Amino acid sequence: MDPITTLATRLGEHLRRFNAQVTTAESCTGGGIAEAITRVPGSSAWFEAGYVTYSNAQKTRQLGVPEVLFGQVGAVSQEVVEAMVRGAQAASGARFAVAVSGVAGPDGGSPAKPVGTVWLAWGDGSRVFSERRQFDGDREAVRRQTVIAALDGLLQLGTE
């Protein structure tokens, strides 16, 4: 079985045990996390909603990310992904959430945020955790590694 499908299946098993639901807020993965989750039969029991907010305007409109953050720290930042997690939880009512924003490439990188830079955040209803990751490879490799890291982080939330 594909590692992404394996992680998503394990996530579903954990969420069913908690009788909990998850939501996703995605930028650079373009819905890839939600797609991986909904690949799992029965995911409608534990997947509440997915938000693909590729533009900054949609991050603000759909998830309530303060517009001022984009000018202060940029879309690929800890502050933005943490706001995305909180916004997705508020909009969906799901207990667990994951958010990602990154530079998948091949363009768009900078010295401070080179191609492969991704910020991820996870929320469990009371706490939000985030981390910056640097992935290697082409656009698809960065996106795939981001999906894996996002699902793995959700699994770790569910087992703490």
UniProtKB/Swiss-Prot annotation:
Keywords: Hydrolase, Pyridine nucleotide biosynthesis. It comes from Pseudomonas putida. It catalyses: beta-nicotinamide D-ribonucleotide + H2O = nicotinate beta-D-ribonucleotide + NH4(+). It is an enzyme of class 3 (hydrolase). This is Nicotinamide-nucleotide amidohydrolase PncC. Transmembrane segments: none annotated. Homodimer. Gene3D superfamilies: CinA-like (3.90.950.20). It holds the Pfam family CinA. GO terms for molecular function: nicotinamide-nucleotide amidase activity. The keyword Transport does not apply. Its EC number is 3.5.1.42. GO terms for biological process: pyridine nucleotide biosynthetic process. It comes from the Bacteria. Belongs to the CinA family. PncC subfamily. The gene is pncC. Has NMN aminohydrolase activity, not active on other substrates. InterPro entries: CinA-like_C, CinA_C.
